[in-house]
Amino acid sequence: WNAYKVHELAEKALLRAHELGSSNTWVLSNHDIIRHATRFGVDGTFDTGKWFKANRFNPKVNVKQGLERATAMTMLLLALPGSTYLYQGEELGLQENMEIPDELMQDPQFFRNPDLGLSRDGCRVPLPWTASAANAYGFSTRDVEPWLPQPDGWGSYAIGPEHDSDASMLTLYQRILRSRKSLDAEAPLE
């Protein structure tokens, strides 16, 4: 988390796209990496592989800091020219599920190299739609176990409660996206 480094990376990407006559594509999270709201909640430089191997508890994640930094980075990316991809659940402020036991892992990467303990399943957990844990937090129409377990408290990130709150991450994303839509995409960068 370094403002100079972020500026340097964005500037290089923008200049390179300009040289090539193309546009940029920005992304903070996807189905193969730790959710950015979790990554940004860890201070300092750390090895993601070692973090997974250590059951993802060392260093500890500062959830509040992660969400604040994720919000700042999202606002920055959505202000930049080009396309921005949003990964499912980031608009809710979802954290990485770091509590999936080995016996419930689904990721082929985990089974190919079990000694490494690496899995991408923590960012692939079904989204919470309702605050109630019933029916996999509303992800299903029946009371069934989802293919990956949802962590306790997942309902606090649910779409329903977030939709009803002016202070929620979902509402913030909606406001930012409306603002982005109103920007002049053809304006030169200064």
Language model regions located:
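Active-site and adjacent substrate-binding regions of carbohydrate-active enzymes
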Residues: 1-190
